[in-house]
Amino acid sequence: MEDMIRLLAAELGQKPQHVGAVVRLLDEGNTIPFIARYRKEQHGAMDDTTLRTLAERLQYLRNLDQRREEIRRSIAAQEKLTDELDAALQAAVTLSELEDLYRPYKPKRRTRATIARERGLAPLAEQLLGQARDLPDPLTLAAGFADPARGVETPEDALAGASDIVAETVSDDAAVRKALRSLMQRQSVLRTQAAKGKEEETSVYQLYYDFRQPVPRLQGHQILAVNRGEREGFLKVTLETDREQALICVRRCVLVPGGGAAAFLRAACEDAYDRLIAPSMERELRAALTEQANEGAIRNFALNLRPLLMQPPVRGHVTMGLDPGYSHGCKVAVVDPTGKVLDTAVVYPTFSKAKRAEAIETLRRLMDRYEVTHIALGNGTASRETEAMVCELLRQKHGAAYMIVSEAGASVYSASPLAAEEFPQYDVNLRSAVSIARRLQDPLAELVKIDPKAIGVGQYQHDVPEKQLDEALSGVVEDCVNAVGVDLNTASPSLLRRVAGLNATTAKNIVAYREEHGAFTARRQVLKVPKLGQRAYEQAAGFLRVPESPQVLDHTGVHPESYAAAETLLGLCGYRLADVGALTELPARLEAYGPARAAEACGIGLPTMRDIVRELCKPGRDPRDELPQPALRTDVQELKDLKPGMVLTGTVRNVIDFGVFVDIGVHQDGLVHISQVCNKFIKHPSEAVSVGDVVRVAVLEVDEKRKRISLTMRGVPKDGETGPDCQKTAR
């Protein structure tokens, strides 16, 4: 375990004692959000992303150790485990290294080498591989192994069988495979061509009909696109490796300078490479590239999901949600500032001029009746026509504004059992309009009801391993929910189940308890909820807010275990609990007293004390409120209105490997290629922007026919500055 901790510490750039503390906390059953927030002193204040990376690597290394022991036992059972081999197994740090070492001892199907061994030719192969300087001519040596009774008719047959054994031995050699793996990763080229019969067919894979790229320069999105094109029968894919360079690698590992049987062994090495090594290592390299691409796609999805969930809520407004459509009309829902449905309707603005006028009048009446100030417009089918109608309406209704809201996943949610349980009285289509309205009011509370994969901010999410994607995205959702905290008396089961220590069952039990007994008036009261024990309470308590509690600390993110410390801290600075919420001088008084001295007096560490001070100064703080508010609109442009050089403000909708998609209000997102994101080289656009960022862009090119907009952020003035400098700001 100590070796594992040192390795993790080196990989993550953390101190071994901090990594060891995290391992212990995880093994004790603590959740990542709890460790990140309330055990900072023990792990050096790692953030939740680092902690999740650590947990994943820890699991990988433990699985590696388990596989190492399985291999050791298997080889030992064959009585072939030498001290040298055991040391090599212990030194292996990747699964491929372990499997390479195990390969010669792994049970195999019946091969040409197996048959040759059955015919008694293993000693001949061993002599030839021994390469003694005084070794007789191979054919002369093979004459002694000819045995018609065993199927070896001639010396040539014996030599051929020995060659099969040597080829398999070379193929199974860990050093050979390691050298070739390194060569192929550095020098191989991926080539794709149109599959037979597809050469003239138009498809999304045309870019890859004649494509060559060195392996080190392959991008994740290219690998996943090629894999999909091959799977769908559009592409033929090959890996090209310099055969002579590969054979040099093999011979260096096998041949002894000046040794006997050199010509025979050279031929056997060629056979080993062509027949056994190259096909298997090409498959291995393709698999490794796919794994890397999958990890990148999952990482990209998680990077995009976090800022989407953490978009600032638009609180305190009656909001109208519009789910556009053609044949089924535009679905309308009006919700109050708490998200409660006030009214619904269906209008048909695309049917005729008369229906459009009727739709505008219906929306105007609803806005007047309920004093609607904000409109959330879904970005799906018929959104362009609906947006034009909304703009015409807003020219009559001054003071109101609208925002385009991604409706990704809304239809999935509206048809789900959860939506049916929440809105049994409403049609499926109307539920999606409610969801769209609520997404503007509180994106996090609404988006947690939807499978993260359906939110649509990734690339190739349907091609990556579902289990890995689910785990990564669930972690992001959990981190976001706990970073914000939840109101114990208003949170839905969907939100509560994401709180550290809770699950779907305890979340439903909390809601059932408050429906039966009324609002919670203290955090500890949650311990009365069935199936919610002390351990779950410890993990969850700090993330649950109870504004109705007479204990003011229940309104904050201060953990109950630190209540005494918080009161002591207030006393040291001349305050009482009753002063919480009006502590503008607390930081200055603490500085005058001495932070280290105060932390010692309170029996806590400095990181915990800083968190407590932040909560006391702003009880019930929501980190999302500190981020830029979403951009609201009152008018719209058309694609034909765009001209090269125009400078616009837009909202980042998606960040992928090759660029950034930006909504600039023309029904078609524009693309900022990675080379146009900022004034210096970046490896990934996420280094500069995140989903939800409001950015300034300039139009480079407009292709109306293909509905493509090329944008740039380079040298575009923003807020009086000279242009983006690639320094990503906190959102």
Predicted regions: what is each one?
Residues 1-20, 27:
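Generic start-of-chain signal for non-secretory N-termini
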Residues 4, 56, 62-80, 90, ...:
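Long, highly charged, low-complexity intrinsically disordered interaction regions
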Residues 15-16, 28-29, 95-96, 109, ...:
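Short flexible coil/turn linkers enriched for glycine and charged/polar residues
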Residues 34, 50-53, 60-321, 325-426, ...:
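Duplex nucleic acid-engaging cores and interfaces of nucleic-acid transaction enzymes
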Residues 38-40, 129, 242, 324, ...:
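Short, ordered loop/turn segments at secondary-structure junctions
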Residues 74, 98-102, 229-242, 252-277, ...:
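Structured, non-catalytic alpha/beta "coupling" segments that mediate domain-domain communication
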Residues 182-189, 322-326, 380-385, 405-412, ...:
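A glycine-rich phosphate-binding loop feature that marks nucleotide/adenosyl-phosphate handling sites
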Residues 546-731:
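Single-stranded RNA-binding regions, centering on S1/OB-family and related RNA-binding modules
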